[in-house]
Regions:
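N-terminal [4Fe-4S]-dependent radical SAM core
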Residues: 1-35, 67-78, 281
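Core AdoMet radical
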Residues: 27-31, 47-191, 212-214
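Short cysteine clusters
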Residues: 39, 43-46
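Auxiliary Fe-S-binding modules of radical SAM enzymes
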Residues: 1-12, 173-182, 187-297
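Short, small-residue-rich loop/turn micro-motifs
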Residues: 37-39, 145-147, 217-219
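Short, flexible active-site-adjacent loop segments at beta-strand->alpha-helix junctions, enriched
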Residues: 10-12, 21, 37, 90, ...
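Residues at the C-termini of beta-strands that transition into short coil/loop
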Residues: 21, 142-145, 254-256
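Short, conserved loop/turn and helix-capping segments at secondary-structure boundaries
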Residues: 33, 55, 162, 229-237
């Protein structure tokens, strides 16, 4: 078992985090933590896509990380490669007031740790993101693209106040110019978006000498069934090869622990149950009532 999953009940909000080891905590530790309780963006493959409670405070964000290290008796100073990713529940850039001070504190507490902001690209002031990334040189930036056309992406990510694919390219290049670090785009590889034409569109949008690609095997929303099946892994691997041929550096996001208690964002049973038990706190998001995309068969 290389993954541990945690739920935090803040009384007025619920959050979740995941802790990974590859293969030991001393060699590589990865933490995925929440920045919001629920999510207003409503991605149709995400278990948190139906409801939004509130943004988390900086203390609540930092507290998740501190608890995970303490719970497994991990000494961050002895970890060869440590990564803290803001990519569990919530859209980080819709909580810059909580995220920015949390990043500064985490950088002071764990100066060796890489800090990754994973965003669906809402329309916010990206100059603030660039400035924060220059100030804290451990910050990385990843845009959740997931499709090669805006039409298909809009069906997957119904939140309207977001950047287009072309606008993401512009902001990513500006971030690269400001920081000297390569941004990532993440892409959910499924049966309908892994053609050569998809790879060509991505290459035309995102310059391979600037961008790196993260290909995800998890494109389903499901509380009880393993999502990262072998077919998904094969699709991801084949599409990574297509992108490699076009000059991209690629990596695979294959989160361990996609098991019968639900491993993806917002899928842990306690989170789902908490949302159902607190209808006055868990407000309907833009995705509520829309069809689920890529449901497992």
């Amino acid at each position: 078992e290389n993954v541990s999953k945690y739920v935090f009940d803040f009384n007025s909000a619920v959050a979740e985090s995941a802790l990974y080891k590859y293969p030991t905590y001393e060699q590589r530790t990865v933490i995925c933590c929440s920045t919001q309780s629920g999510c207003p963006v409503g991605c149709r493959f995400c278990g948190a896509g139906d409801a939004f409670v509130r943004s988390l405070t900086a203390n609540e964000i930092v507290g998740q990380v501190e608890h995970l290290f303490a719970d497994r008796n991990i000494d961050p100073t002895k970890v060869e490669r440590c990564q803290i990713m803001f990519m569990s529940m919530g859209e980080p850039l819709l909580n810059l007031m909580g995220l920015a001070p949390a990043i500064r504190r985490l950088n002071r507490l764990y100066p060796k740790a890489a800090l990754l902001i994973s965003t669906s690209a809402p329309k916010v002031d990206y100059a603030q993101v660039r400035n924060l990334s220059v100030e804290v040189d451990k910050v990385g930036l990843q845009f959740s693209v997931h499709e090669s056309t805006d039409e298909r992406r809009n069906a997957l990510v119904p939140f309207k106040a977001k950047l287009t694919l072309a606008e993401i390219a512009i902001e990513g290049e500006a971030w690269f110019e400001a920081t000297g670090r390569q941004p990532f785009f993440s892409y959910c590889a499924h049966a309908e978006n892994v053609s050569d034409a998809d790879a060509d569109r991505l290459m035309n949008l995102y310059k391979p000498d600037i961008w790196q690609a993260t290909i995800s095997v998890v494109c389903e929303r499901d509380e009880s069934v393993a999502a990262a099946n072998q077919r998904q892994r094969d699709l991801a691997s084949d599409f990574m090869s297509k992108l490699n041929e076009r000059g991209f550096s690629t990596r695979c996001f294959d989160p361990a622990g996609q098991d019968d208690i639900g491993g993806g964002c917002g899928q842990l049973w306690f989170v789902q149950d908490w949302m159902r038990r607190n209808p006055t706190l868990a407000k309907r998001s833009v995705g509520h009532g829309l069809p689920v995309i890529h449901t497992p068969t």
